[in-house]
């Protein structure tokens, strides 16, 4: 299965991706992990990403998309994947669709984890990370609403909305049931 995971920060995408990856036998591909791997391995793409990050700038879509393309071309992703953190914008969604079409594929589903902002704030504050204060969290949620939420409409034909306010196990079961797995 070829899947994209959507949802605000703190929705539990990473947790669910790990469980789904095991259940579906496909790799969990996180853009954060891709950045770290490319930078630590000193790849050309990693060096480009590092330059932008060192300058305090966002890594351009072209660099991120190239990292994703390289990862999707690895053997373990031949039969499917879970993408987490890409696409974040309509432009990136269109690039992903082109990448998949070039290989004769398309997305099977886009899983949108739905969770209230108050629950997100509570979850993220409970993590105890230094950069997780309520103002920062609400700013991240606003960025998500403005940039990533339009993908929900873009993917309406393959979108599965999943209530992400239950237990980890319940959310995982609901997701697998929605995928008929």
From Swiss-Prot:
<dbReference type="GO" id="GO:0004017">
    <property type="term" value="F:adenylate kinase activity"/>
</dbReference>
<dbReference type="GO" id="GO:0005737">
    <property type="term" value="C:cytoplasm"/>
</dbReference>
<comment type="pathway">
    <text>Purine metabolism; AMP biosynthesis via salvage pathway; AMP from ADP: step 1/1.</text>
</comment>
<dbReference type="InterPro" id="IPR033690">
    <property type="entry name" value="Adenylat_kinase_CS"/>
</dbReference>
<dbReference type="GO" id="GO:0044209">
    <property type="term" value="P:AMP salvage"/>
</dbReference>
<protein>
    <recommendedName>
        <fullName>Adenylate kinase</fullName>
        <ecNumber>2.7.4.3</ecNumber>
    </recommendedName>
</protein>
<feature type="binding site">
    <location>
        <position position="129"/>
    </location>
    <ligand>
        <name>AMP</name>
    </ligand>
</feature>
<keyword id="KW-0418">Kinase</keyword>
<feature type="binding site">
    <location>
        <begin position="57"/>
        <end position="59"/>
    </location>
    <ligand>
        <name>AMP</name>
    </ligand>
</feature>
<dbReference type="Pfam" id="PF00406">
    <property type="entry name" value="ADK"/>
</dbReference>
<dbReference type="InterPro" id="IPR006259">
    <property type="entry name" value="Adenyl_kin_sub"/>
</dbReference>
<feature type="binding site">
    <location>
        <position position="166"/>
    </location>
    <ligand>
        <name>ATP</name>
    </ligand>
</feature>
<feature type="binding site">
    <location>
        <position position="127"/>
    </location>
    <ligand>
        <name>ATP</name>
    </ligand>
</feature>
<keyword id="KW-0808">Transferase</keyword>
<keyword id="KW-0545">Nucleotide biosynthesis</keyword>
<feature type="binding site">
    <location>
        <begin position="85"/>
        <end position="88"/>
    </location>
    <ligand>
        <name>AMP</name>
    </ligand>
</feature>
<keyword id="KW-0067">ATP-binding</keyword>
<comment type="subunit">
    <text>Monomer.</text>
</comment>
<dbReference type="InterPro" id="IPR027417">
    <property type="entry name" value="P-loop_NTPase"/>
</dbReference>
<feature type="binding site">
    <location>
        <position position="31"/>
    </location>
    <ligand>
        <name>AMP</name>
    </ligand>
</feature>
<keyword id="KW-0963">Cytoplasm</keyword>
<feature type="binding site">
    <location>
        <position position="36"/>
    </location>
    <ligand>
        <name>AMP</name>
    </ligand>
</feature>
<dbReference type="InterPro" id="IPR000850">
    <property type="entry name" value="Adenylat/UMP-CMP_kin"/>
</dbReference>
<comment type="function">
    <text>Catalyzes the reversible transfer of the terminal phosphate group between ATP and AMP. Plays an important role in cellular energy homeostasis and in adenine nucleotide metabolism.</text>
</comment>
<feature type="binding site">
    <location>
        <position position="140"/>
    </location>
    <ligand>
        <name>AMP</name>
    </ligand>
</feature>
<feature type="region of interest" description="NMP">
    <location>
        <begin position="30"/>
        <end position="59"/>
    </location>
</feature>
<comment type="similarity">
    <text>Belongs to the adenylate kinase family.</text>
</comment>
<dbReference type="GO" id="GO:0005524">
    <property type="term" value="F:ATP binding"/>
</dbReference>
<feature type="binding site">
    <location>
        <position position="92"/>
    </location>
    <ligand>
        <name>AMP</name>
    </ligand>
</feature>
<feature type="region of interest" description="LID">
    <location>
        <begin position="126"/>
        <end position="132"/>
    </location>
</feature>
<feature type="binding site">
    <location>
        <begin position="10"/>
        <end position="15"/>
    </location>
    <ligand>
        <name>ATP</name>
    </ligand>
</feature>
<keyword id="KW-0547">Nucleotide-binding</keyword>
């Amino acid at each position: 299965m070829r899947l994209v995971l959507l949802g605000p920060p703190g929705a539990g995408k990473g947790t669910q991706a790990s469980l789904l990856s095991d259940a579906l036998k496909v790799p969990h591909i996180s853009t954060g992990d891709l950045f770290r791997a490319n930078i630590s391995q000193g790849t050309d793409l990693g060096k480009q990403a590092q330059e932008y990050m060192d300058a305090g700038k966002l890594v351009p879509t072209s660099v991120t998309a190239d990292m994703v393309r390289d990862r999707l071309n690895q053997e373990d992703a031949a039969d499917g994947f879970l993408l987490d953190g890409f696409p974040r914008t309509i432009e990136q969604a269109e690039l992903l669709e082109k990448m998949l079409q070039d290989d004769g594929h398309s997305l099977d589903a886009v899983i949108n984890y739905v969770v209230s902002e108050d629950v997100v704030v509570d979850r993220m504050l409970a993590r105890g990370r230094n950069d997780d204060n309520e103002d920062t969290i609400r700013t991240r949620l606003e960025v998500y609403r403005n940039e990533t939420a339009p993908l929900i409409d873009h993917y309406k034909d393959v979108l599965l909305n999943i209530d992400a306010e239950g237990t980890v196990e319940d959310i995982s079961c609901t997701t697998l049931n929605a995928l008929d797995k």
